[in-house]
């Protein structure tokens, strides 16, 4: 079985893979085909099943495990598989979808333990109570959901993994800049993307919910915090509550990026920069994992449509 990360350009492969997503499309000639994304625990790759028949459309659905044969190619410098032959995995074959999903490289319990250790460092009582309340409310989802649909940390457990990496960066930054309020940084980071559990449907065949499309996670987390403030009987007009809401509402940094306000305190600016840093690192790493040493990646649209080069010291 060929892992997706081990597929080489112009080489044939075969193996079992999960259909992460599938979309029925038509060619210019009006013929049906399936635009698919295949996945195993090492990564994802796209491919098209041409001249799709009704049986193909009925059988090859998201969440199904298939045996695939084909050729790994480049199209517009993007890796894809072509000349695909597919069949559904049989009962005695490795057909459990959970075996193929890309997951956080850190085990869930380790993520839980680390995040809980950071919660103990949130010294402001109001922020601490809000964080604990929402972590309890979305306990299961917070550690299972991805942080994004496609761009970064788009895998099972990606949300908590993203938060953990950001918290580790924040711990170092508050050492270098001791004037920063560490408690606000930690609370803001844990909460900033938590409403992704409301914005997305889950880690399998991830799609936007109606709330996600119409409202978005930035406004949704502000609503969650505001409701929590009322439930806990806190003063919604106190400075600490307003500052917590501010770092959450401003964490995308710019109005063009979806934040209704721009950062107006140091902690808000730092959370935005840490968020961007971790997301960008993940996008670069994901793209570089698809190419060999000495090659360049396909263009990464969220990173100003740039290519990145895989240097000799990278695995």
Each predicted region: which residue ranges?
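OB-fold nucleic-acid-binding modules
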Residues: 1-13
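Structural detector for short beta-strands of small beta-barrel domains
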Residues: 11-28
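Divalent metal-coordination and catalytic microenvironments
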Residues: 17, 63, 166, 275
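OB-fold single-stranded nucleic acid-binding module
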Residues: 23-32, 45, 52-98
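Short, acidic/hydrophobic/Gly-rich beta-strand patch recurrent on exposed beta strands
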Residues: 35-40, 202
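Acidic/His-rich, divalent-metal-binding segments that scaffold phosphate/diphosphate chemistry
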Residues: 92-214, 238
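Divalent metal-dependent catalytic cores for phosphoryl transfer on phosphate-bearing substrates
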Residues: 151-152, 161, 172-293
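N-terminal intrinsically disordered, cationic/polar leader segments
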Residues: 272, 290, 294-307, 312-315
């Amino acid at each position: 079985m060929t892992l997706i990360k081990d597929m080489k350009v112009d080489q044939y492969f075969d193996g079992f893979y999960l259909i992460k997503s599938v979309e029925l499309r038509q060619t210019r000639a009006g013929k049906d085909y399936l635009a698919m994304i295949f996945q195993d625990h090492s990564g994802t790759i796209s491919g098209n099943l041409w001249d799709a028949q009704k049986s193909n459309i009925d059988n090859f659905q998201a969440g199904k495990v298939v045996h695939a044969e084909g050729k790994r190619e480049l199209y517009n410098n993007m890796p894809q598989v072509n000349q695909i032959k597919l069949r559904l995995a049989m009962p005695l074959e490795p057909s459990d979808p959970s075996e193929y999903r890309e997951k956080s490289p850190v085990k869930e319990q380790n993520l839980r333990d680390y995040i809980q250790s950071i919660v103990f460092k949130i010294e402001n009582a109001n922020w601490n109570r809000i964080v604990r309340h929402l972590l309890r409310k979305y306990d299961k989802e917070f550690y299972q959901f991805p942080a994004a649909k496609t761009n970064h940390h788009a895998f099972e457990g990606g949300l908590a993994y993203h938060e953990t990496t950001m918290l580790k960066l924040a711990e170092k930054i508050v050492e270098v800049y001791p004037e920063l309020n560490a408690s606000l940084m930690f609370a803001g980071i844990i909460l900033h993307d938590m409403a992704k559990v409301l914005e997305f449907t889950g880690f399998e065949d991830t799609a936007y919910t109606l709330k996600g499309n119409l409202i978005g996670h930035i406004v949704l987390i502000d609503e969650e915090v505001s409701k929590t403030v009322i439930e806990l009987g806190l003063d919604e007009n106190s400075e600490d509550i307003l500052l917590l809401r501010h770092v959450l509402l401003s964490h995308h940094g710019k109005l063009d990026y979806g934040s209704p306000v721009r950062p107006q305190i140091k902690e808000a600016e730092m959370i935005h920069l840490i968020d961007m840093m971790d997301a960008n690192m993940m996008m670069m790493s994901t793209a570089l994992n698809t190419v060999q040493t000495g090659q360049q990646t396909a263009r990464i649209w969220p990173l100003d449509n740039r290519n990145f080069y895989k240097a000799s010291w990278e695995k």
